[in-house]
Amino acid sequence: MVSILTQLNDHFAQALEGQFPSDVTLPTPLVVPASNPKFGDFQCNIALPLAKQLGQPPRAIAMEIVDKVNLSEICEPLTIAGPGFINIKLLPDYLGEQLIKLQQNQQLGVSLVKGEERIVVDFSSPNIAKEMHVGHLRSTIIGDCLARVLEFRGYDVLRLNHVGDWGTQFGMLITYLKEVYPEALVTADALDIGDLVTFYKQAKQRFDQDEQFRETSRQAVVALQAGDAKSIKAWQLLCEQSRREFQLIYDCLDITIEERGESFYNPFLPGVVELLQEKDLLVEDNGAQCVFLDGFTNKDGDRLPLIVQKSDGGYNYATTDLAALNYRLNTDGAEKIIYVTDAGQANHFAQFFQVAEKAGILTDPTQVVHVPFGLVKGEDGKKLKTRAGDTIRLKDLLTEAVTRARQDLETRLTAEERSETEEFKTEVAQRVGIGAVKYADLSQNRTSDYVFSFDKMLALQGNTAPYMLYAYARIQSISREGGIDFAQMDSGEIVLTEPTELVLAKNLLQFADVIETVEISLLPNRLCDYLYELSKVFNRFYENCPVLKASDPQRGSRLLLCDLTARTLKLGLSLLGIPVLDRM
């Protein structure tokens, strides 16, 4: 199904083909959504830039364009405002026809891409032996949302979890556990993740203060890298313990992701160094092998190195990133790779991408994109922490969200004098609590910091998940009250006469354009903004237009509008990773 915006642009392009001198370039896009609804639904603003090329008044050019374009079956007669803005107002009958097509379309108007382009989305990426914290929330749910949108568009998406499962910290941890709890290095489940994190902190403290411990830890890393059987077994047990804990979080958030940690790329690291050597990119600096790039300097103006091999022969994470990129392009067959990490890593990715280009690993038309995000802050405006000043564990945050959602539900049930089963209350609390956390994050422009507030995210009013879920549940109550199975409804006819019907119709027809915008911008908040506006528009429609008590054809038409709204909300929320509820 072709979106209305695309149809209008096609009509204008066909009508204006060959109408201007060959040296004149038509601005694009020809048609855009109206900046103000009072002027219409769409507008064509090209007369002003064309005036400079043609040396003619923009209003005269606008009049010429209006004469050439025939949109009589789509919109009311075109009007010209101001110096040459062409306003387009869609016909109600045309809107009704488009809605019927939308109702018959499983994808709700979103077209599938041609061919199966493979896109890698690299997200989440926690570190072994550490608990996932609130910082991992953003990468995990933003990455999941982008993967869902791309999958829905028909791309072949490979979701990868680049966990930190290798490096000095393992030598440090293994050395410490040999002293204080050797059983953990030979027995599965000897530790829970909390104990492991505590031991990690204690090991780090020893590493920073004790030279002998530091040297023993380095030897443990060497043994691990050399494939020593006992060291490998200990490492595998530690990784497996963390992996199980990560999976509990992923199950709670409904995240599907394939783990491929840093250790996977170990065999390829010497080859990366050799390649950079062959390309004459390496410079020795204090015994380390580095790449120096233009445009990356410290405060004194000295060029910053990208270290690929340390002075002790070990490799840096930049080396692993280069090996991973090479593998993803040449073995996984990726045509685009999206990295979802905090904005603090922007400099690293800019350097890494530039080195990859210079080394010939990254070539056109392959795309690599860093998708940065800001911090999660507390209501005091500072980085979100516990009262004790520690980083908030993601597990605790999600548990509290569900607990608070349950408390809100119990309060509401008491006020409404409703009685519900334990199963109902558990499901509603889980979906509302987790959905609220996800939506609160995704509804922010990801490049910005945002303030985390349980009270705001769980509110039934405003731009929140509960508000969207309630709008969906309200439509399901119409279905139950009227004994109507939306899935069995005939397409029928959509009659749009009331102002709120027209506004709802126009909003429903914007879904495909919104999904395209999210795909291009990689900004999930664009979808959240749309769903919030759709929910508000539907609620105004519901308050002003009787549905079940209306007479046909209005009754059938309004039921179809309700069904389309419910389907759009359900699909849109599912792309955010939020399941709906028939009752709340």
Swiss-Prot record:
InterPro entries, per database record: aa-tRNA-synth_I_CS (IPR001412), Arg-tRNA-ligase (IPR001278), Arg-tRNA-synth_N (IPR005148), Arg-tRNA-synth_N_sf (IPR036695), ArgRS_core (IPR035684), DALR_anticod-bd (IPR008909), Rossmann-like_a/b/a_fold (IPR014729), tRNAsynth_Ia_anticodon-bd (IPR009080)
Family indicated by similarity: Belongs to the class-I aminoacyl-tRNA synthetase family.
GO molecular function, a single term: arginine-tRNA ligase activity
This enzyme's EC code(s): 6.1.1.19
SMART domains listed in its UniProt record: Arg_tRNA_synt_N, DALR_1
GO biological process: arginyl-tRNA aminoacylation
Subcellular location, record wording: Cytoplasm
Organism: Synechocystis sp. (strain ATCC 27184 / PCC 6803 / Kazusa)
Enzyme class: ligase
Pfam families linked to this entry: Arg_tRNA_synt_N, DALR_1, tRNA-synt_1d
Subunit structure comment from the entry: Monomer.
Main location: cytoplasm
The protein's name in its UniProt record: Arginine--tRNA ligase
CC annotations in GO: cytoplasm
Gene that encodes it: argS
Keywords: Aminoacyl-tRNA synthetase, ATP-binding, Cytoplasm, Ligase, Nucleotide-binding, Protein biosynthesis
Catalysis performed (reactions): tRNA(Arg) + L-arginine + ATP = L-arginyl-tRNA(Arg) + AMP + diphosphate
Motif ('HIGH' region): 126-136
